[in-house]
Amino acid sequence: MTIQRRTLFATAAISAAGMTLTGCAAQAAKAEAAAAAFVPPTAEKPLLLCFNENPLGMSPAAKKAVAAAAEKGSRYPFARVEVLRKAVAQYMGGKTDNILLTHGSAEAIRASIESYKTADVQVVAPELTYSDGTDTADKNGMKVTRVAMGKDWSIDIAAMKKAVSSWKGSSVVYFVNPNNPTSTIVNSTELLDWIASRPARTVFVVDEAYAEFVADPTFKSAKTLVDAGFENVIVLRTFSKIFAMAGMRLGFAYAVPATIARVKKHVAYDIMMSVPAIEAALAEFADPAFLTYSREQNAEARTILTAALDKLGIAYLPSQTNFVFMNLKAPLKPFADRMKAEAIWVGRPFPPALTWCRVSLGTPAETAYFVKKLFEFREKGWV
């Protein structure tokens, strides 16, 4: 199947309606250039709008660093791990003993929750969120308390507080902020004040995988409490999202030294990171312009998609990440199957939001192509 460049460009331009004339002209030029290089997806090489990855790939500097790392592959990475730990600490504004390096944030989630496993512990999490936290609890035989969502799939902090205060044992509270799959943030003041109140026998695991994408000025990272010395909070970050290193498997936990020491007992060796991953991460840190460019491209793609959804009358939640959560008002599976037939993969089901679809943002050209398919689906009565 082919798509005319003119058609793709027109879709992007229409979707960007509502921007200022100057902004629209600038975006039009970028969209036209991107459309010129765009290759439509195929069954063998589908458009992956399902995993919330950075569609730009690693920065050129990181790719070169990975290739050069082959020369170091025969040696253990002890020294370079410490260089990376120092770089991560500097990035977070902390010290090296605040950092626990992990194989992706998945290991950090698991280790953080397992380190607080007791006979009377419960893991408290919103009903609609990334499932690694509750999955870890289930695998460890820990009680899981899933708290119903508030209006518009918001996280009901008051209800979560009640779940903790009414429990006689210990609690691990798992937050994803910005939340996945909703792409929304919680009220920072409300969350941080709760953590700072130090509820008895309670630790907070705050997964900030998408923090680098947030544009809302009211957002505050829970790292501020770590910096203030609070021992009851662990902040998790990953290199899988804006850093475009999902396949490299690198993440970290950020907490006060005593908390880091506790969690560290539940990872194999935080000095045994992959050499290519270490070198890629260091290269990314040395190239802040790439992160800025990634944010800009993500924002442009988001504008293309949300403008189209507005035009189509499809509701969606305000996005603070690299994906959008939209309401199909119909079961997800038929839509996902039809998109897959077009070589486009969208997000999996997220109960209980069974009529909602999480769409990862591709490049502006990829997103414009998805938008074109949305309009075609509307013509067929499918959305």
Question: Where are each of the predicted segments found?
Answer:
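PLP-dependent enzyme catalytic core of the Aspartate aminotransferase-like
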Residues: R338-A341, F350-V383
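N-terminal secretory signal peptides and thylakoid transit peptides that target proteins
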Residues: M1-T22
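N-terminal "arm"/small-domain region of PLP-dependent enzymes with the aminotransferase-like
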Residues: C24-R75, G169
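PLP-dependent aminotransferase class I/II
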Residues: N232-L317
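Phosphate-binding glycine-rich loop
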Residues: E82-Q122, N140
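PLP-dependent aminotransferase-like
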Residues: S115-F175
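Active-site phosphate-binding strand-loop segment of PLP-dependent enzymes
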Residues: K151-P217
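Conserved PLP-binding catalytic core of the aspartate aminotransferase-like
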Residues: M149-K151, N298-A299, L309-E342, L361
